[in-house]
Every structure is written in C-alpha cells, then in structure tokens.
Amino acid sequence: MTTPPPAARLDVIALDCPDPAVMAAFYAAVLGTEIDEAESRDADWVQLQRPGGRAGGGVALAFQQVADHRPPQWPGAEHPQQLHLDLAVDDLEAGEAAVVALGARKHAVQPGDTFRVFLDPAGHPFCLVVG
C-alpha cells in the first residue's frame, strides 16, 4: 500500500499578538535566528527566517498583529489556548534561565517535571522540553 502524496505542506505557523516586532525579537533570540525582512510585510506581520530556507522545507514562525488581543488562559477555559509551542533544549535549568532573561515568565502551574511552561511577551504559553 502506498501513501498518497500530501495535499499540502506546513509552511508558516502564525501567532496572533499585540506587537509583532516585540514577539519576533523575543522568539528570534530564543531560537537563535533572525527576522526575515523579505517576508515581513509591514508592522502587522513579522516573520522569522526558516531553518534551511523555503527550499529546505523549513517551517517559518510569524507574528500577526491583532487589535484587542487577549492572551490565552492556561489552564482554564475562559479564553483557552488553541496552540502552543514545544521548544527543545539540552538542559531545562539553562533553558529556563535563558528564556526568562529574554523576557519570558515562568507559569505558576507546572504540571510535570520533564518540561516547563512559560508565557511569552504576549502571554502565549510555550514549553521547554529536553530533546
């Protein structure tokens, strides 16, 4: 049995936020990449460079300005998160120190000991995992 060809490829993951430039600077520093000026349309959309470039199949991370942005609430369902990023690190303690120094806040709820939950500058939850 052969697998049919994909109907599409994952190209960009875009996060809504109040200030795309702030979010792009934060995640560029966390991920060790840069803003992709050619793909960043204006102040309303800022995109990071893709690992390996578009031809290399890399997925881009972008930030889109939304008026009256409300950060997701986790845990809870008042304004639930619909997506979160898991970012791999070699060492949780060192990773925590690095993301906090860059502007992340450690979430009060930590449901496990193999990963850590943080909030980015716009309040989106993300996790650091060893991997």
Pin down the residues of each PLM region.
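Catalytic beta/alpha-barrel core
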Residues: 86-88
